[in-house]
Amino acid sequence: QLLTAEQTGWDWFSLHLNDGRKLMAYRLRGGGEDGGDYLFTHLMDARGTTQQRGTDGVVLTPLEIQRVARRDIPTTWQLTLPDAGLDLTIEARHPNRWMPTTVPYWEGDVTVRDTATQEALGVGYLEMTGYEVND
């Protein structure tokens, strides 16, 4: 795996919102400040103007964990970017997408909804690594 000794994996999101915005978010688990996670987002508006954000105000939380290939995989997430007015629920369309390659990972398409209203806001892609077998 292409990680430091302190990092256990990553969760990477590429989201295309219906209003034309595009959002990339990733979390490196471990290795951040005080041993915590490192979270980064990059938001592009419909005109192509970008804003980079670190961890300030951004919250990424697993909402649902499913058992996939003997691993506990987060298949539904909440991503909140208060400065951008976004509170998103991101859900895997096909949870059983574990790839048992040399660097094992989960990848698949996701749907994006407004957390409060459940209105469909877009689609995207999610890739996750570092989820170990947990018998």
Where do the protein language model's features map onto the residues?
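Structured soluble/peripheral alpha/beta segments that form catalytic or ligand/cofactor-binding pockets
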Residues: 1-135
